[in-house]
Amino acid sequence: ASSGLSDAPIRWIVDDCAKFVEREIRRGRKYDAVIMDPPSYGRGPSGEIWKLEENLFPFVELVTGVLSDEPLFFLINSYTTGLAPSVLTYLLETLVSRKYGGRTESQELGLPVTATGLALPCGATGRWTAE
């Protein structure tokens, strides 16, 4: 891998993440960092429906259950154009910062448009980091 991380202890989860997190909580496993890039909309194999606007808060709340006692960071990327960075700030402040302290920041994601020199909004990112 060109990233140089092929031997690093990283678990890439592309399955039903909520079920994975629930299993990890039952097993007592903990993680120092979380990177999530949830879809705007999706359907599970049994017809379950995922809508970012409805499911992100409870999912982030669930995921905090696998954070270690001294986590390093929690990153959320979203390419849902209607999701403001302030929503990610609220989620991370409410669910992570209140428990662990640290610092939260969020910003809009954009694609540069060469012809205009402007950026085309395409989502938001939010990051909590320990201090």
Predicted features and spans:
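Conserved protein kinase catalytic core
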Residues: 22, 43, 83
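Active-site-proximal loop/turn and secondary-structure-junction residues that shape catalytic pockets
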Residues: 16-18, 40, 80
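General structural feature for long, well-ordered alpha-helical segments within catalytic domains
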Residues: 13-17, 59, 84, 88
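Short amphipathic alpha-helical segments
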Residues: 25-26, 46-49, 87-89
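Mobile active-site "lid"/loop adjacent to the S-adenosyl-L-methionine
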Residues: 14, 31-62
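S-adenosyl-L-methionine
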Residues: 1-35
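A short, conserved beta-to-alpha structural element at the edge of catalytic cores
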Residues: 64-69
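C-terminal catalytic and target-recognition region of SAM-dependent MTase-like enzymes
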Residues: 70-131
